[in-house]
Amino acid sequence: MGDSNFDDVLVLIPARMASTRLPGKPLADICGLPMIVQVAMRAKEAEIGRVVVAVDDPQVFDTVAAAGFEVVMTSKDHQSGSDRIFEALKKIDPDGKAKFIVNVQGDLPTIEPETVRAALRPLENEAVDIGTLTIEIDNEEDKTAPHIVKVIGSPISDNRLRGLYFTRATAPYGKGPLYHHIGLYAYRRAALERFVSLGPSTLERRESLEQLRALEAGMRIDAEIVDTVPLGVDTPADLEKARRILSARQN
């Protein structure tokens, strides 16, 4: 952000050991480093603020610390990544120095640093509570796939939408682009505090989409349009793909 300095921004990376499809995911080796360390490296390369990893397992804690990154232990019982990063925030920044919190998922080892930076840009508008990312869908299958979350948004510039709704359905109806939501968030501190204080909302439960809690509470979410979707590692096949991507970058 143009008028923020390094100390204003805190990048938090939640990491959970419990993964049904890929057990021990944070410690999976990618080009000689654990995945969670690769994610922390990408976040550091974004050069937007202090990077802290929020973990729920002593082995992951020790691994991250050994790699030279700041790490904080959090409860195993959190229902969402937002709850985990809020616990971490209270522990590592109790005085409230950080004004903006960027939540980078711990399974995005190939994310481009520029993509991390892009999530902050919507917060340049004082009216925006939460910034996030989106990309135009160019694959017909993705337009109807429930696992591809769509942003229904009103264009406010060539590269930004004001989020009106998020859905797993194919929407909006009619001719025009559809947008895939990328679940990386930048919060104003007060917005994160309010968000976690709210209980799950009606539409959040129905769509299984946490961000709807914010919209139902009247909070504003704007989405920056980016060029690439970061690879989320959820399966062994994803892990192999991530290894190929990072290996190619290193060579």
Swiss-Prot record:
Keyword Nucleotidyltransferase included in the entry's annotation: yes
Keyword flag Nucleotidyltransferase: yes
InterPro entries xrefs: Cytidylyl_trans, KdsB, Nucleotide-diphossugar_trans
Gene3D superfamilies, per database record: Spore Coat Polysaccharide Biosynthesis Protein SpsA, Chain A (3.90.550.10)
Catalytic activity: 3-deoxy-alpha-D-manno-oct-2-ulosonate + CTP = CMP-3-deoxy-beta-D-manno-octulosonate + diphosphate
Leading EC class: transferase
EC assignment: 2.7.7.38
Keywords in alphabetical order: Cytoplasm, Lipopolysaccharide biosynthesis, Nucleotidyltransferase, Transferase
Metabolic or biological pathway: Nucleotide-sugar biosynthesis; CMP-3-deoxy-D-manno-octulosonate biosynthesis; CMP-3-deoxy-D-manno-octulosonate from 3-deoxy-D-manno-octulosonate and CTP: step 1/1; Bacterial outer membrane biogenesis; lipopolysaccharide biosynthesis
Primary localisation category: cytoplasm
Localization annotation: Cytoplasm
A UniProt-annotated Pfam family: CTP_transf_3
Cellular component annotations (GO), alphabetically ordered: cytosol
Biological process according to GO: CMP-keto-3-deoxy-D-manno-octulosonic acid biosynthetic process; lipopolysaccharide biosynthetic process
Gene Ontology MF terms: 3-deoxy-manno-octulosonate cytidylyltransferase activity
Family of this protein: Belongs to the KdsB family.
Function: Activates KDO (a required 8-carbon sugar) for incorporation into bacterial lipopolysaccharide in Gram-negative bacteria.
Entry-linked NCBIfam families: kdsB, PRK05450.1-1, PRK05450.1-5
Name assigned to this protein: 3-deoxy-manno-octulosonate cytidylyltransferase
Gene source species: Rhizobium etli (strain ATCC 51251 / DSM 11541 / JCM 21823 / NBRC 15573 / CFN 42)
